[in-house]
C-alpha cells in the first residue's frame, strides 16, 4: 500500500503556517491523517484491498481494487469511516480540555462540514451515491451525480467570490474539487466500457 501527499497540500500548508504558525499546520495535518485512518479501518473491516492513500486538503482518497464490486453496505461504511473518525476526535476535544482544544474543535467541524456536503468526491457524496445508485444503471446514476456536483461547485464558487479575500482558501478547494469532477466526467465512458466487458464476461 502506497502513501503520498497531494502536491496541492504544499501551498495550503504554507498559507496555514504563515497565518497560524506551526501549531495550526500540525493540527490540520494530524486531523487529516486521523480522518483518513477512519476510512482505512472501514476498508479493512470490509475486506477491501487498499492500493494507495493520498492525503488531500479535504481529507484523503483511497484507491481500492474493485471498489464498485463491493456491496452497497460496504461502500457506505467506507464513505462514513472518515467522518466517524473526525466526529470522535471532535467529541474528545469537546469533553477534554487541553492546550489547543478549541483549535482542534474548529478544525474538526470544518472538516466535517466540508466532507459531508452531498457532492462528489466528498464523503457525503460518496455515501449518497452508495445509497442511491442502481447496478443496472450505475453509469447513468454516476454521470447525473457528477453533473450535479459540478453545478453545485460552480454556484458555490460564484457565491464565495463575493467574500474575497477571506474566502480565498475555500475557493481554491472548490476549484480543485470541480476540476476533479470534470476529469472524472471526461473519462466516464471508459468506465462504461469496463462495466460492459465485465458484464459480458459474467454472462
What residue spans do the PLM features occupy?
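Hydrophobic transmembrane alpha-helices and their immediate loop junctions
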Residues: 1-203
Amino acid at each position: 500500500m502506497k502513501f503520498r501527499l497531494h502536491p496541492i497540500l504544499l501551498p495550503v500548508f504554507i498559507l496555514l503556517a504563515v497565518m497560524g504558525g506551526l501549531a495550526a499546520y500540525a493540527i490540520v495535518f494530524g486531523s487529516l491523517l486521523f480522518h483518513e485512518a477512519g476510512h482505512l479501518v472501514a476498508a479493512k473491516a470490509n475486506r477491501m484491498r487498499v492500493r494507495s492513500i493520498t492525503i488531500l486538503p479535504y481529507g484523503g482518497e483511497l484507491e481500492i481494487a474493485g471498489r464498485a464490486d463491493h456491496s452497497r453496505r460496504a461502500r457506505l461504511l467506507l464513505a462514513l469511516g472518515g467522518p466517524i473518525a473526525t466526529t470522535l476526535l471532535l467529541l474528545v476535544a469537546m469533553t477534554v480540555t487541553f492546550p489547543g482544544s478549541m483549535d482542534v474543535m474548529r478544525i474538526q467541524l470544518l472538516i466535517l462540514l466540508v466532507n459531508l456536503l452531498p457532492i462528489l468526491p466528498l464523503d457525503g457524496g460518496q455515501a449518497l451515491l452508495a445509497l442511491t445508485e442502481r447496478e443496472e444503471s450505475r453509469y447513468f446514476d454516476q454521470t447525473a451525480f457528477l453533473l450535479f456536483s459540478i453545478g453545485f461547485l460552480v454556484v458555490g464558487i460564484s457565491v464565495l467570490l463575493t467574500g474575497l479575500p477571506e474566502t480565498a482558501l475555500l475557493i481554491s478547494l472548490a476549484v480543485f474539487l470541480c476540476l476533479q469532477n470534470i476529469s472524472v466526467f471526461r473519462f466516464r465512458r471508459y468506465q462504461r466500457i469496463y462495466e460492459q466487458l465485465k458484464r459480458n464476461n459474467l454472462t
